[in-house]
Amino acid sequence: MGPTRVPRRTVLFQRERTGLTYRVPALLCVPPRPTLLAFAEQRLSPDDSHAHRLVLRRGTLTRGSVRWGTLSVLETAVLEEHRSMNPCPVLDEHSGTIFLFFIAVLGHTPEAVQIATGKNAARLCCVTSCDAGLTWGSVRDLTEEAIGAALQDWATFAVGPGHGVQLRSGRLLVPAYTYHVDRRECFGKICWTSPHSLAFYSDDHGISWHCGGLVPNLRSGECQLAAVDGDFLYCNARSPLGNRVQALSADEGTSFLPGELVPTLAETARGCQGSIVGFLAPPSIEPQDDRWTGSPRNTPHSPCFNLRVQESSGEGARGLLERWMPRLPLCYPQSRSPENHGLEPGSDGDKTSWTPECPMSSDSMLQSPTWLLYSHPAGRRARLHMGIYLSRSPLDPHSWTEPWVIYEGPSGYSDLAFLGPMPGASLVFACLFESGTRTSYEDISFCLFSLADVLENVPTGLEMLSLRDKAQGHCWPS
């Protein structure tokens, strides 16, 4: 492998001399042109309690580059006396409607105060656009409709941040998390809470919204979702446990099976938000190279096979498959739109525990498995060096590669988007991420890269060790 390529970076939002700061990016690709929508929080200072309102820049992709419009303030995305935070857009492909979810938090109440007191100050809000983000409708407060009585057991909650997804069934999903009140003491003055990921969903193209069940066991927070072939949903979440948490849903996010730690995806100190996006792998790339599977134990999957569990487990991916589909044939559709992405079936450990039983036909030979990309700071002690990770078997927590660092320096929150195949290139992706030279909240940057770039630049061995925690700048957790 030659010198590592670093994609060209464009700064879309930059901290101003007045102290005005831009944080918490979200990115959405709107076909067919496509149009890119880059969202962010505008804050009076870097502090969470000084969040103010949401802003947007629209970009048009032409001939491999993006032409960006000027910054606009989303004037309708606000509740009176509340601050708007955590942009989380999702597109309904059937109607072309964009739903921008966010939370509106009363005054300057910090999240930490809500967690300590058990007194929620957040509202679940949404605005919509039917013209690719040019105009936005009035705000909807969905708190009572979507959460209802469950809110009394939530110390606080938030959506995303980053993009939501739409499943093949049409269900719209918005990733979220809550600090659930486990118990109260001293007449309710002391509150014991634990964070849990979840999803809000709609089955009627956004007319009504509902709250799904929590990831039940491990502490999990800010998360993103990806569809899994076989009608499963994959959740990847921030955690204070030292590694990311993944969890599966067999009912499209209505509930989640117990989560499990992903040992190959380390968290920074106190954790950091990360982004995932799923896509169909190109059939021309052979899966035999152990370099891309993350483990020499991994063996290629047939795109159409029956799964037989050889070893029992009550949790995670293996437990899900054991309970719901011990001998279910899984086949990939031969034609799917670029916006409907799935994940390849797999296990939570050694793939030798899965036995292929369905002979591959000439048609199935043309079908490709699906992969995941994941973006997150590569530093383990601080938020440094934005990395792109690849998994060719997403349900296997050992399948992730080491990161390809696309930006050296302080880095924070990010959001990925899949743009599809482009002329003269392989599959193309975009990343919107917090960056800076001394702190991770100086800029929000944008870059484009292809799957070929990822395959060429992902490290294969221990070459990340010298970079991961190289001192550079000051990165404050949040």
Swiss-Prot record:
Optimum pH is 4.4-6.5. The active site is at D47, D48, Y413, E434. The keyword Kinase does not apply. Pfam families: BNR_2 (PF13088). It is a peripheral membrane protein. Exo-alpha-sialidase that catalyzes the hydrolytic cleavage of the terminal sialic acid (N-acetylneuraminic acid, Neu5Ac) of a glycan moiety in the catabolism of glycolipids, glycoproteins and oligosacharides. Efficiently hydrolyzes gangliosides including alpha-(2->3)-sialylated GD1a and GM3 and alpha-(2->8)-sialylated GD3. Hydrolyzes poly-alpha-(2->8)-sialylated neural cell adhesion molecule NCAM1 likely at growth cones, suppressing neurite outgrowth in hippocampal neurons. This is Sialidase-4. The gene is Neu4.
